[in-house]
């Protein structure tokens, strides 16, 4: 939250804090545990993007009067000139592409989002952030799931849902 506030201040745009803790727990964490309990591999990032970021967040932003929301996903949204449909496309930096975690987004959602980082490499993004003196320019990147400490799924499940851990054959 503090990084977002610093960036918003640097860009001179309003910053709002909305608590999605319960929604995240109910829609993402419970799903994650439930899928593991069923022996399936969950994709909590897809779930979070669909229900929290591009669901509740979009709804709240529109209610605050925003026309669109920009995120830091490395993907692109383009509107087809002939059909008017919005197309979700891979980010130009294929090493950082995140279009795969956005595949569930509908036309109604896509029309309200901008993904400006999808047109740049990670290196170029950092360079631009540095030139703009953004406080996150050199922040280490993360590849793991945001709520799993040290990317240790087993320890997380053992702590949060020990009843689902059963030895295999």
Name each model feature, range by range.
Residues 104-168:
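Internal nucleotide-binding/catalytic subdomain
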Residues 1-103, 114, 124, 130:
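ATP-dependent adenylation/nucleotidyltransferase module used to activate substrates
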Residues 88, 168-169:
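Short polybasic amphipathic segments
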